[in-house]
Regions:
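Short beta-strand-to-coil "C-cap" segments at the C-terminal boundary of structured domains/repeats
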Residues: 171-174
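Conserved beta-strand segments that form the floor/walls of ligand-binding pockets within enzyme
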Residues: 99, 104, 138-140, 169
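Conserved SAM-binding loop
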Residues: 19, 111, 141
């Protein structure tokens, strides 16, 4: 876990890209975003993610869903959690880290650098420690999702040896 995302060397390529907190006023376009048919087994639908966010907040726990926008156009969705859920067999790291709970770029906007750029924006958000200080940012990916695995590793995430069901857990030191 010695790698750290080097934000000083990472420059966002899509200058209009920004995060917008998901609200009741803007969630409909986020629910319309889709991945490719081949990617559907790798990430839950945004409608499921937004329902989970609503339920998590109703329980008084921290979760922040975001629309990823290029200008006025929604191109992706992400959701950050922190001590947001507990279940039997959950990775230990999720008990003491910020978690990238969901991340997707719509199939129409993939292969344009939005994924890496959005991860940089999410990193900048997380290091403000909106729900308290942590040393780690965790995420996971379904085995076989080589695109996600490569992106996360290129950004400094490393496997920590844990699994979350069929997902490989990765961490980034903050």
């Amino acid at each position: 876990m010695t790698n750290k995302m080097d934000i000083s060397n990472y420059e966002i390529k899509n200058k209009g890209l920004h995060l917008v907190k998901a609200t009741k006023e803007n969630f409909w376009p986020l629910m319309d975003l889709r991945v490719t048919k081949e990617q559907e087994n790798f990430v839950a639908a945004n409608s499921v993610s937004l329902a989970q966010a609503y339920d998590t907040r109703a329980d008084g726990k921290f979760v922040q869903p975001f629309g990823i926008f290029d200008g006025e156009t929604p191109v992706g969705f992400a959701m950050i959690g922190h001590h947001s859920y507990e279940y039997e067999g959950m990775p230990e790291v999720d008990k003491h880290s910020y978690s990238l709970w969901r991340f997707m770029i719509d199939y129409r906007y993939q292969k344009r650098g939005y994924g890496r750029d959005a991860m940089k924006l999410l990193y900048d958000y997380i290091i403000t420690f909106p729900d308290g200080k942590e040393d780690l940012w965790s995420t996971s990916y379904v085995e076989g999702n080589d695109i996600a695995a490569k992106m996360y590793r290129d950004l400094g995430f490393e496997p920590n040896g844990e699994k979350d069901g069929d997902e490989i857990v990765l961490v980034l030191k903050l």
